[in-house]
Amino acid sequence: MAMGKDVLILGNKSSEQKHDLRDSLTEKYIGGMGETARRMLPGTNPDWQGGILRFKMKVDSEKQNYFTVRCWGSESDNAMVMLFIEGKQLGYRHLGDYDLLHRGNGGTPCQGRFYYYTVPLPLNYTRGKKEVNLEMRSYGNTWDYGDTFEKYQKKMEGPTIGFYKVYMDVQPCFLPDKNEKQGKDEVSLAPVRPAPGIEVLNQLKETVSARINHILAKDTPLGQQEVWLLADAYSVKWTPAFQNPKVVDAVIRNIDHYYTKYLEKPAIISSDPSVYNGDWMTTCLLARSIRSLWSELQDSLEVSVNGATRRDIWSQLMIASLDYGTTHRRHYTNQSMIIDMAIYECNRALMLMNPRKALPEYQTLRYLYESLALAPWLGKETPDGPERPLGDHYWQLTDKALTKELGFVGYYGEVVDWLIHIYRATAIPGVPFSGDLKIKDQLLRVANARYNFRYPAIDEEGYKCFRAEAVVGWRDGNHYPGDVIYGDRGTAWDATPLMAAAATLDQRTVGVAQQMLEDNQFFYAVAEKLKDAGNIRVLQSYLHIPDEYELIMKQTPSEEKLPMSVSAPDYVFSDEEDGVVAIKNGSEILYASLYWRARNAVNNLAKVHYITPTFERLANVHIETEFEDSGMRYTRPDWVNLGFAGWREWYKGIHSAHAGEVLPIARIPEGVKFKPGDENIYAGKADYYELKYGNYVIAINGSTDKTFELSVPKAKAVFNLTDHKKKVEEDVLKVSPRTTVVLEVR
């Protein structure tokens, strides 16, 4: 006999007693809309572990059970909450396919509304049982890049958000009772931000000018980022660096000094602490400086320095960078782009100084084309030629122009700024719009694909905005809510809010930029960036913001808007290679990754973000797949931290509820090196995905040569959202290669 929905009302004495709730370091309170809730607290001497809620919940003894929590979207924290079943941890703390229950980022995800978060319970813990013992354990947040426990695991220094109710059900799409209180449509009622205004550009100019004057006055060696700031500012009229001879002297002096450091420590080429990700960037910023100031620098190159000409010693730096970069290429898209951009910049500088020692232009341009999916990606160079670790036909972007890492990624997939840097690298310094046209076209394709993943929301102060969708992203750990983003991820270190529009003057990018200006989120984004002025990498991005603003303000109004705008027509965007969909259907928006963090094997899991005017749902759910079975199997290790590796297993005494699960591995193409346990884009990729979630049925055919059949649900009416909302009369629909079908069941 099927179980009905079991509900625990937290803060309600009767309900808590019924579920045998026991707690430590928690408090109950009256929260959103007058509802009771409990939140977990840190200890009196804050440590990384906090309060715990322990309780029992009824389960269905045969079917898949789903656990859901109800949270108030106006609350925020910087804590993490993991769910445990019978003493074992569910999900992973960082980027697991079975996701964690909660991780705050200090933001309020949907102000004035509730949201529901759903995760699946392992069948082997519920089969044959009527109830299970569950725990919600709280922890401090983590810093994802920490390489020691102390750096990685932060102390819990404040309370968690409140948890209002927990539910157990067999439906993957949680349906709240009709009498459950919900918020109102805050998004459509949100006002336009009144401030700040243009005064922030004056503040920006003062901040940049002060930093440049400080750098010019230094009598100690400059780092690469400082050198590039001066060189870049040399052509910016409002800065004290503009056509300032001291800039040229400083650039020459400090590249010479860098060579001295290189002689003392050749490894500095890939480990320079003055530049971010030195093993990616090498001497890219010095190369940019040389290219930018070439007419001012070239007469000094025959001067003798350390027994050789300046031309020769600077060339040695570029050659060393090329040797390292070409043999250390990476396949994650954003990393590939940055590394290949650095290779290209260094080679172009070398072509100016010592063309006979430079690589052919077509070779370094080919690297860029590979990173941008204008040519197949072949990997690093070896003595026998390109390594080809993913075969001869791996493309860094999908046909729909999304990155593959391995599936859809939110923030790491926001690579338009890097494409613009690459486009500018191929341009003649000082000549706008002179970059490679194929690269320009590709960056516009990528920008248009990313626009599908911005949704209407409200910012932290209650004003109208658009946010980036990252809930369904493979490499997005705590990005709910997502950042305020329109076209470009303007608050990122190397980006500016109007970057794509200013670099291309394409009508759609200009329209999206104008939409940001209409909502008065541009000046706020600049003000937010100014908070990081101490980071010279961020300050570097300030240089061109005023000129970009002036350029966009001169453009005629564009009718183009973001596709999820309230006034925009309904539509479905699908990317069959990434296994992701974005659906606008009336007042509802649904994002789903059906190919979800399947790094090692096919996992039959998806991630969903379902947005309605009055509440939101986030869910980690089971789906159906079809694929060619390799016959190989992957057994989940007993990992509880990283969902993809076992080298940070610092949480002694905690064990995974998923350990021992055996998963099938899809067919690996011939010629691709692989063994069970390897992360591989082919190992977990199915040919066909099918998700049933609430009133939606989503079928994705990711294959290039197979057709699958989708059984149409029996219902009063079914409409095909991918075919002009036509009413479906058939019992079965054909899903052709590289197509998606989305049905709405009414």
Regions found by a protein language model. Give the residues of each.
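Extracytoplasmic
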Residues: 1-188
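Short, acidic/polar N-cap/turn motifs at the starts of alpha helices
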Residues: 54, 80, 203, 207, ...
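Extended polysaccharide-engagement surfaces of secreted carbohydrate-active enzymes
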Residues: 54, 416, 429-712, 717-722
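Solvent-exposed beta-hairpin/edge-strand motifs
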Residues: 77-85, 713-728
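N-terminal module-boundary/linker segments of secreted carbohydrate-active enzymes
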Residues: 188-208
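Aromatic-lined, polymer-binding surfaces characteristic
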Residues: 209, 213-440
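C-terminal beta-strand-rich structural cap/linker in extracellular carbohydrate-active enzymes
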Residues: 729-746
